[in-house]
Amino acid sequence: MVKLIASDLDGTLLQNGAHDVNPIVFDQIRTLKEHGIMFAAASGRQYLNLRRLFTPVQDDIAYIAENGSLCIYNEETISKGIIEQDLAYRILDEVAKYPQYNCIISGERVCYKIGRAHV
């Protein structure tokens, strides 16, 4: 018996450069829920970006965000991967040596861009 269906976004639910999920997908997610099957949006994207993409069903699905390092269901963090603070500072120090690069640091609900390169 199927209990969970997870799908990637870019190149799967969002094809050919699409920026919005096809509304038919939301109907399918609702049908899955009616049959007791959970849907999870899985992506390298940030959690809040995923919630925005799935606004019509955002409270009915699970999220596997940040390439799997952040999993949230019912606004509760199920699991998260954390980089040790010392390692994070070492990475930032290394990136700072290359002014043409930026570093994006993602948290559960916020991200920071560090660097001088034009994005």
Give residue spans per PLM region.
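A short acidic/small-residue loop/turn micro-motif
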Residues: 21-23
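Asp-based phosphoryl-transfer active-site loop
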Residues: 3-18, 91
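Active-site phosphate-binding/coordination module
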Residues: 26-116
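Short, small/polar residue-rich loop motifs at catalytic or cofactor-binding pockets
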Residues: 1-2, 65
